[in-house]
């Protein structure tokens, strides 16, 4: 090939500098700060792995978690009965400072054998332990839960509440050790879609929103040293949870998730 003329060489160098930089797929796929990114591709469960009580990590028993019509659906039609098989669908990456948006709805009837409290009950677990460290018969990961509840047609039943398997929080300036506390949301009956969000600032403040309205706020999510599973996760006497995995729940009532989006926030 002949050598480039000086004008051609300058043109080639200019074009090369103007070309967009091609990033490795792993870097290009990472959520960018201050931008909403979908964690669900609308086609399959790529990036997500189930852990169901009594089954090995990765065993999607009974096709519990499936994708149909661009929606993550939690179903129990292949179960004889629920039998305490609580499930969690884990996303592959850990997060620390972020805002998570989930659109969900409850449908159909509860699986036979499901506990009464789990009727129209699901949620998102965050600051989760590594699912690979969970016991085979462990019902819930050590985590904080944004608990989703559907109305029962009578009375008040708030959603995007807080529950704390193996953890505690600081609420109104005091260590809060009961398992759950309610938000101040409205009750959502029927099979309507509901938008729930959580804003997490590492081991600092956590806020819960429903349909854009702030319904709960607390701080300092931390391991409970009295919990057997949490105790194994404590290192150097540090209890505060700075980061963790995210998971979607299966608690015996059919539920659907059509949007799971995250916005990574600056620390």
Language-model segments: which ranges?
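Carbohydrate-interacting regions of secretory-pathway proteins
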Residues: 25-267
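N-terminal secretory signal peptides that target proteins for export/translocation
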Residues: 1-6
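Bacterial N-terminal signal peptides
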Residues: 9-20
């Amino acid at each position: 090939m002949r050598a480039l003329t000086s004008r051609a060489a300058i043109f080639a160098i200019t074009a090369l500098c103007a070309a967009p930089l091609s990033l490795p797929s792993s870097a290009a796929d990472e959520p960018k700060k201050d931008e909403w990114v979908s964690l669900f591709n609308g086609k399959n469960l790529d990036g997500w792995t189930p852990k169901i009580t009594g089954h090995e990590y990765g065993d999607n028993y009974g096709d519990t978690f499936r994708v149909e019509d661009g929606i993550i659906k939690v179903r129990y039609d292949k179960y004889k009965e629920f039998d305490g098989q609580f499930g969690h669908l884990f996303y592959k990456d850990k997060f620390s400072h972020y805002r998570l948006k989930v659109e969900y709805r409850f449908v159909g009837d509860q699986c036979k054998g499901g506990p009464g409290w789990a009727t129209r009950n699901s949620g998102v677990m965050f600051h989760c332990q590594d699912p690979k460290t969970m016991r085979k018969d462990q019902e819930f990961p050590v985590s904080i839960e944004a608990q989703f509840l559907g109305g029962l047609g009578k009375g008040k039943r708030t959603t995007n509440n807080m529950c704390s398997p193996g953890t505690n929080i600081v609420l109104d300036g005091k260590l809060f050790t009961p398992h759950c506390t309610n938000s101040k949301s409205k009750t959502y009956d029927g099979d309507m879609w509901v938008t729930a969000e959580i804003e997490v600032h590492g081991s600092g403040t956590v806020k819960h929103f429903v349909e854009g309205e702030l319904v709960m706020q607390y701080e300092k999510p931390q391991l409970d040293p009295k919990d057997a599973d949490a105790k194994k996760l404590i290192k150097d006497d540090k209890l505060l949870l700075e980061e963790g995995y995210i998971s979607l729940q299966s608690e015996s009532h059919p539920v659907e998730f059509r949007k799971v989006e995250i916005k990574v926030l600056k620390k």
